[in-house]
Amino acid sequence: MKKKIFAMFALLLLFIPSFVFAKSYDVDEYLKLDFDDDWYVFTKSNIKDNKELEELGVSEEYMENLFKSSNVVVDAILFADDNNDTKEVFVRTTETKDLYNLNDNTDSYINEFADGFISSVKEQGIEVVNSKVYKSNNNAYVYLEYSDSNLNVIEYFTVVNGNGYAIQVQKTNSFTESEKDSFEEIIDKASFKILKQEKNDDNNKEQEKENNKSSNYVTNIIVGAIIGALVGALYGLIYTKRKAKKNKSEK
């Protein structure tokens, strides 16, 4: 009888879906991102005494240097059986004095901005394979797919509260449609605390001048700070360590 009950229970489990829970991370004072719990996610505020960093054999000092040297505020990694399918997500930020909130502008300005942004990326020698304006959750992004440093990259870029945010995922192999959808879901769930720019008469005049500037003027400054694949971050370090350990064990 007990065996029969156990068999029925085991069969029932086959039809119960497994759930992957998401956790919310504070990127900075304005942005929160959700990642499923199978991601390793590191931010400026959570690396101290972080057990997952210890598990990966990565030092707090290494992460601090990465954050300082690359305008990075988030480094998240999702391991795959095939190293070439391991995905790494970065969020990079840069100040944008000439633009406060991208989505506060007209569609024509946003499209012009996107065109200027894409042109500036191409001028960096980066091969852009797909691009568009993407709108989600009351925000506007410039969407890019490109190749750089033998890595494939998908990037969403926006400007909120006078800060440019580049949210990108990269891996060696090409992205599947399912992977693109999964990353898009992270973007769709991104939560920005959007502040309205305080304006007086002088500010209005200055803003009008800034909006009349060529989008290329604005985007050339931004692109130089946050575009391109990041080589030698978590994935590079962990892969190198694992390879060295494997070589040592084979001797």
Question: Language-model features: where?
Answer:
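Proline-anchored loop/turn motifs at beta-strand termini and strand-loop-strand connectors
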Residues: 28-48
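Conserved polar/disulfide-associated segments of primarily extracytoplasmic proteins
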Residues: 47-154, 165-166, 209-214, 235
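Positively charged n-region of N-terminal signal peptides that target proteins for export
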Residues: 1-5
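Surface-exposed amphipathic alpha-helical segments
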Residues: 37-41, 165-215
